[in-house]
Amino acid sequence: MIEKSTMATRAKSNTMRALDDIRGGFDQRELWLYLGWREIKSQYSRSIIGPLWLTLSMGMMVLGLGVLYSEILKIDVANYLPRLAIGLIVWGLINGIIIGACRIFSVAGGAMRQIRMPVSMFIFQFIWSQLLVFAHNFLVYIIIAVVFLMNPGWNVLLFFPALLLVVLSGFFISMILGPLCARFRDVPMIIGSVMQIVFFMTPIIWSADQMPRRAWVLTANPFYHFIEIIRDPLLGKTGTALNWTASIGITIALGAIATVFFARYRARVVYWS
């Protein structure tokens, strides 16, 4: 009985320390906002257009795939290109977070051993850098919206809570994958391979309407729900109740799992990195 009480007290103590770590990490926002921007900027040092290469690369991919697959799928390019662009841009954010989360603490290991600071600070920095990449890529959608005279109307406001759900889920995933991948170095390769398969199983290049008989496959795909709640408002739609409910439910579940996982392994990350 005493042993169970001690274990419960210890778990509660670890959870409180983890929450304090997250609060402390957020309080360091001036530092991680600067470091996140510097990380992106340093990748394109001495380049003429700098981080705008992100925008240019995404633009060329959208244009190339859009022209090709609109012919293959026999879809009007004016209808296909905006949908494809948003799908690729959102996938870039999701994929970047999941793949990059595996390297958070292996990259920050040196700094963690030399400077005492909240472990979550490095997660905040990473998520911020991914948002900066997303912002550069999002310029492609803005250009397409202007070219094709798109008017999503007031539904576009739903884009902001949708993006918040994606970012929160990304933060929670990073709290899990960061320590996990620091401990087991084969996990990043496994995740990288899985994400390549998931890309083709998610309606990014193709549309969900093209697979009506296998709708359950989409329902079981969490990436589909997150992409749709962002894509629909930008196309002037509200999104389905299923997509929103699934996205909110997944975010809450990830938050609960991440809190328990981070509370248990947060203190060991510095030894694994």
Language-model segments: which ranges?
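Hydrophobic transmembrane alpha-helices and immediately adjacent juxtamembrane helices
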Residues: M1-S273
